[in-house]
Amino acid sequence: MNTRQPHYWKRACADLSAQDPVLASLIARYPDAVLADRGDPFQTLARAFVGQQISVKSADSIWERFAARCASVSPDVVARLDAGDLDGCGLSQRKVEYLRDLACHFDDGRIDPLGWQSMDDEAVIAELIAVRGIGRWTAEMFLIFGLRRPDVWPVDDIGLQRAVGMFYRGGERPSAQMLREHGTRHAPWRTVATWYLWRSLDPMVVQY
């Protein structure tokens, strides 16, 4: 796992703190902030599948059980699994199918991680959502935790919706359009803003 702070992190924190009192307070509250990545694009995407539409705590528990069933959480191993191999892990049948399809894409070369470094955010998202089960939210989680891109604002994320509603809208959860408009104030550091808003809901460091 890469636990080194992204090169842009300190500047982003300084800019956000100067512009937004809510984020200034959160950044000061969590000075140990590290946006870590797992260093393995397949595992990062697989974790994002597991975490779709459930809490971080639940996702961590399911991932631990899933990893325990695999000799190695790698494309060649996961591609050979069937639903029976994963009974009791807490994964839905659909998520099992998605994980196997993702593994096949890596295993046969239809996904080539080397190309992502030269692609902008929207190009990476477009490539990823061509994979079965990967929607925009999953692709955005990969941009944040896999590529550690600085300006990702996942408007479909439940935690981000809750935090923005709590801090900026008097407890009212915003619509996707409202959240999209709100995010413009945090550009070009929306990943960092997202990460601290997540921390406000769960003081444990968010990882995928």
Segments the model singles out, each with a brief description of its role:
Residues 33, 48, 52-53, 69, ...:
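Alpha-helix C-capping/helix-to-loop hinge sites
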Residues 45-50, 99-103, 142, 193-197:
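Short alpha-helical scaffolding segments that buttress acidic/His motifs in well-ordered protein cores
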Residues 22, 54-55, 59-132, 187:
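Alpha-helical ds-nucleic-acid-binding substructure associated with the helix-hairpin-helix region
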Residues 35-43, 90-94, 183-190:
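Structural motif
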Residues 44-49, 65, 81-85, 123-127, ...:
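A general alpha-helix detector
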Residues 37, 57-61, 73, 94, ...:
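Alpha-helix N-cap and coil->helix boundary residues
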Residues 1-33, 117, 121-122, 136-208:
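C-terminal accessory module of base-excision DNA glycosylases/AP lyases that mediates lesion recognition
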Residues 18-48, 53-71:
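A positional/architectural concept
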